[in-house]
Regions:
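Compositionally biased terminal segments of proteins
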Residues: 1-177
């Protein structure tokens, strides 16, 4: 993509090489996003395999699959930007059509983040919490129950920097995590 944009006369900048490039020409720019800022939700072939057909400005396009949108937005918990409301709205609108097995698989070892959003969804929309299938909640809560039966590691780990690039820096820089 960047090569094609460069060949079309765009200048390319990579302000965050691990996830974002920008292409500029005249007064216009295009963000080329190929991962999440934390490096977890990398754009891979599955984004394209499951893309949703749509139309933008009367042009046919392939849109990000809802599962990948949920996955990538779920980790955005900055002081100045929290995508939790977006997650709740996406779940309210699309929970019945989601490929929940694929979504759970996408979260992998970060399943607690998905569980936290599912729990918050039940708080935000208590009368609609059954939009999230019971087996999904049972699976995630089952993982939590199993985790609680496993002794904690002695290793000092702070995964907060996966959720916020700034808010957990004291943990890493000052408190020994």
């Amino acid at each position: 993509v960047l090569g094609a944009l460069a060949a079309a006369g765009f200048s390319i900048d990579r302000p965050f090489p691990h996830w974002l490039a920008k292409a500029y020409r005249g007064g216009y720019y295009i963000d080329v996003i190929y991962s999440s800022g934390n490096g977890i939700a990398r754009v891979d072939d599955r984004w394209f395999e499951h893309a949703v057909a749509g139309e933008v400005l009367e042009r046919p396009v392939r849109l990000v699959p809802p599962e990948e949108m949920l996955w990538s937005k779920s980790f955005i918990m900055e002081r100045e930007r929290y995508d939790g409301a977006d997650i709740a709205h996406l779940l309210r609108a699309l929970a019945s059509t989601l490929d929940w097995r694929r979504l759970i698989e996408r979260f992998g070892g970060y399943w607690r983040v998905l569980l936290s959003h599912a729990v918050l969804f039940g708080f935000v929309y208590p009368g609609e919490r059954d939009r999230i299938p019971a087996w999904v909640m049972e699976t995630l809560v089952g993982r939590l129950e199993q985790d609680l039966r496993t002794p904690s590691s002695d290793e000092r780990i702070c995964q907060g920097t996966i959720l916020s690039r700034q808010q957990y820096l004291p943990d890493v820089e000052l408190w020994g995590y």
